[in-house]
Amino acid sequence: KAYTVKKRDIIRSYVGVDIDPAVLTEKAGFHSPTGQVMDSAWFKNFTGRLDIQDLTVNPKFDVEDESIDFFWTTEVIEHMKPEFIRPWLEDAHRVLRPGGLVYVSTPNHDGSNDKLPEDHVYEWGFRELHDELTRNWELDIVVGTFCQMPRLRKAMQKDMREEGEMRWTEDQFDILKARFGKQFLRVVAATFYPEIANNCAWILRKPK
């Protein structure tokens, strides 16, 4: 018997925060009787809410203490000056229930280019961001999402010199390269080397 999973079966309610009012306008191809995201059927299935807020001016969420299960932020941190990050994360900690899940994806400057993209204000280094995120939360896992191949090769060689083994063996690496090609290999191989990856995905939890 077929079963349709609706968004509301998984997510009871949702609060999204963005600085740009343009996010309230529905994209072409999605039906909205008013042209607004919040009037689209898919968004109503989320029981959602969208707040327009500049977190550098007001880092406080309009959310009750310990009332959310999941805090998700992707490609946001690099667009804010570092002094604004801690107040924002502190308030995320406030609204997250004990045992709640945190997902953070952001560039890792240790694996990136020295010259930042124009819209990146600041990119955190791997250890720097690790220390900030684990001030309040326990780290479940961090993985690289893609990397520069020369950096990966150097990291593998460093592992061999210092540990006597690599997180990827040369044979595994060559098989993956033959199967997926260089571009996809940048994604697969980065998983085990977050400290030198261009971008990292962090999964953390609020202690119970």
Residue ranges and their predicted role:
Residues 1-11:
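Conserved SAM-binding loop of SAM-dependent methyltransferases across substrates and taxa
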Residues 12-18:
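Conserved SAM-binding motif I beta-strand of class I
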Residues 20-22:
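Conserved SAM/SAH-binding beta-strand->alpha-helix loop
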Residues 27-48, 52-60, 70-72, 80-97, ...:
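S-adenosyl-L-methionine-dependent methyltransferase catalytic module, highlighting the catalytic core
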